[in-house]
């Protein structure tokens, strides 16, 4: 299959297995959820009644005071007591094998092509880190909410885009399923398309 190049005549020949496959919503959902789960810190920690300091001595006699019986001042029903079902640090990561992950990326790319949200350009670079220049370039292409993908890290592009709302830059190695679906359009260079195709082959 062929992808049209926005700023050049002709097109770019790409693999149908990468850019023309059927959209697998269940797979994409599973991979995105797993990716988001892996980003969780999972460091929350509370203390149970046995972990809170103090509370070793019985506060008052079992009988004869007229008060409710109590064995420790660190009971979960007491102020400053332990927590009944205390949260503990845990690993939220989910296993996603390589084939599934690549399948999800291909599925997303194919859907972007179908919806005409993947815009291929011959090259996209700035001579200096100028946000104004980048805004002008994006305006020319009628893009606002966009992920810019280049074949390698472009320092000028990164510095120019970091203060712009709904604009992000990535190199091919930095692409993930969440970033691909988070933006309205994906602007990608022809060299990055070929590099991405090789990585997903």
UniProtKB/Swiss-Prot annotation:
GO cellular component assignments: ribonucleoprotein complex; ribosome
Role played: One of the primary rRNA binding proteins, this protein initially binds near the 5'-end of the 23S rRNA. It is important during the early stages of 50S assembly. It makes multiple contacts with different domains of the 23S rRNA in the assembled 50S subunit and ribosome.
Species classification: Bacteria, Pseudomonadati, Pseudomonadota, Gammaproteobacteria, Alteromonadales
Similarity field: Belongs to the universal ribosomal protein uL4 family.
One Pfam family from the record: Ribosomal_L4
Keyword RNA-binding in annotation: yes
Gene Ontology molecular function terms on file: rRNA binding; structural constituent of ribosome
Gene name linked to the record: rplD
Keyword Ribosomal protein annotated: yes
UniProt subunit comment: Part of the 50S ribosomal subunit.
Residue span of region Disordered: 43-71
Domain of life: Bacteria
NCBIfam families the record matches: rplD_bact (TIGR03953)
Listed name of the protein: Large ribosomal subunit protein uL4
InterPro entries attached to this UniProt entry: Ribosomal_uL4 (IPR002136), Ribosomal_uL4-like (IPR013005), Ribosomal_uL4_dom_sf (IPR023574)
